[in-house]
A protein has these predicted regions:
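Short, amphipathic C-terminal "tail helix"
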Residues: 154-170
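A structural motif corresponding to the C-terminal lobe/cap of the Radical SAM core domain
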Residues: 1-155
């Protein structure tokens, strides 16, 4: 018995962006050291990342992808920042007059018609394109596939390779 998996909301490699989205509710931590300690405890990590957070640009999103590869978690999720109804980001979006989805399907993170918020430097389309490409980059990255093979075997690797052949329609 015991913990075998831990999901971490790593969000962004950019300290300023992380602190801004948490509005000071969380202290900044050395995520690299935390992930190392969790791995040493033989606990697998699901890393969650966000692209298109307020303040994000291509450079900061690339830093987040690079950090995710440095951490090399066994499971990887990436989302485009979405002002979900009821969230603080949604309240900010309403107050700022941002263009929001017209129906709930537009709030779905991976739907074809998802509509994340743009940043000052990036359009929603650019953020989605980056997120989709980052997903492919991570899941076809040989060190990740080697880690999956070590933990789950070649069948799991083959399934991932088949999955990454399917491109999302945009």
């Amino acid at each position: 018995a015991g913990i075998k998996w831990l999901c971490l909301g790593i969000e962004s490699a950019d300290q300023k962006i992380r602190l801004e989205i948490s509005k000071g509710k969380f202290e900044d931590v050395d995520i690299t050291n935390i992930v190392k300690q969790v791995h040493e405890a033989d606990i697998n990590i699901i890393g969650n990342y966000m692209f298109g957070l307020p303040g994000d640009n291509m450079e900061s999103m690339q830093k987040t992808l690079d950090l995710s590869k440095e951490l090399k978690t066994l499971a990887w999720n990436a989302y485009a920042a979405m002002p979900l109804p009821g969230s603080q980001l949604y309240k900010e979006a309403i107050e700022s007059g941002w263009d929001l989805p017209e129906n709930y399907a537009g709030y779905s993170f991976h739907a074809y018609n998802t509509k994340p918020i743009p940043t000052d430097e990036l359009t929603s389309k650019q953020i989605l394109e980056f997120r989709d490409q980052a997903f492919l980059d991570y899941h076809t990255w040989p060190p990740f596939l080697d880690k999956v093979n070590h933990h789950f075997g070649q069948i799991a690797v083959d399934n991932i390779k088949e999955m990454t052949k399917i491109k999302l329609k945009r």
